[in-house]
């Protein structure tokens, strides 16, 4: 759906990814770190790694921490696996994840816990100029985008 939005609004929409690793997803922080490390390789590395890990999240979620699914995915994506391993050792990636987490947490109560008002939160979260669309359909997003463009 994000690709559809970017196609329809190529000059009006910018997608920004932020890490918000939930405690219930034991590999979430590591997945975010792999995406940030992949970003250093250019060629839209963050998005490619993020989407590959997210598309395979059920497998990824159940893995032990020492398994190498992200490295396998990186190789399939044509990334330099040795460089990815080196970049994963950089503490700056952990710092960035912490900063993004704290930034999103500061948005309010909905980000403070995984359950808010009895409703389980879902990630990823989407905001359009600070507004969260009701629903995750192309039409729901387009409605908010159109409203924002009129402002």
Task: Identify the function of each model-found stretch.
Residues 1-75:
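Structural alpha/beta surface segment adjacent to cysteine/selenocysteine redox centers
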Residues 1-6, 71-151:
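C-terminal cap of thioredoxin/glutaredoxin-like
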């Amino acid at each position: 759906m994000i690709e559809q939005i970017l196609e329809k609004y190529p000059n009006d929409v910018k997608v920004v990814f932020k890490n918000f690793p939930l405690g219930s997803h034991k590999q979430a922080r590591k997945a975010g770190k792999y995406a940030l490390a992949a970003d250093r390789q250019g060629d839209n590395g963050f998005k490619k790694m993020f989407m590959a890990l997210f598309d395979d999240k059920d497998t990824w979620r159940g893995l032990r921490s020492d398994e190498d699914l992200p490295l396998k995915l990186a190789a399939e994506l044509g990334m330099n696996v040795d460089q990815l391993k080196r970049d994963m050792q950089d503490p700056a990636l952990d710092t960035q994840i912490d900063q993004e987490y704290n930034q999103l947490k500061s948005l309010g109560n909905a980000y403070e816990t995984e359950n808010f008002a009895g409703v389980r939160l879902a990630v990823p979260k989407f905001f359009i100029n600070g507004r969260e669309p009701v629903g995750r359909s192309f039409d729901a997003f387009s409605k908010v985008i159109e409203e924002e463009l009129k402002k």
